[in-house]
Amino acid sequence: RDGRVAWDWGAGVPVAHLGVSGAGLYRLPIGRFSLRAAFSGDRIALLEPIVVPVVGGEVALDSFLMSGALAAGVRPVWNASASLRDVSLEQLTQVLEWPPFGGVVTGQLREMRYADQVFTIGGGLDFSAFDGDVRVDDLSIQDPLGSVPILRANATLRGLSLEALTQTFSFGLIEGRLDGDLDDLQLVGWQPAHFSVHLYTPQGSDARRRISQRAVENLTELGSGIPAGLSASMLQVFDQFRYNSIDLRVSLDGEVAQLDGLARPDGGYYLVK
């Protein structure tokens, strides 16, 4: 690390220069970056974007303004905006010890704010993944720099490629498109503690819909037996099957998860019809 930080509590606004050869945040390795900022009184203002290499891509801090810095008895408040460019989901999930994802994330983080130890994104987060679109709303992180941060968010998934998704998770091949609604997500210490998610085939989609034998077997383990219309002997004969729709609902509360799908006449449910 090298540079010069000048701070004036008077009328002058000196410019600080700082170069960082490398760092880490939440186990994420961060590459070399530099910054130019103005320090005046209890305010810090970024003068030009900071571009930080991270997990195969870049995170750019486009704007940043903090007030209450180093002021006695005052909690700092800051506002910022940032962007993500080609951040590797595979590397990110590996470092955070999450289930492995493939692909990259490119998106905008607007109206970011930190106050009273709570980080929020007022404008939401839009990015692309698995050849579809993901929007995250109502994102907040309580005590983000503490030992047990609490993340809350809602999200919508639109037009995700099931082929890309199932190949990433080695679940067994499924072809088609997938929509989803994730409500009341809560991560405690970056581990899932609560959520409700509905995953389903979008209406009007003309994408090819095929499901492999392995995927049927894995869904069968999640559900309550062989899907209606299929027998164990048929599973051994055919490698792939056509399907009409997918409908999967999962609710997690603590260590208890509940699974549901499309209602069947016999009182059960379909995960794949």
For the regions a protein language model found, what residue spans apply to each?
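Membrane-proximal interfacial segments on either side of biological membranes
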Residues: 1-273
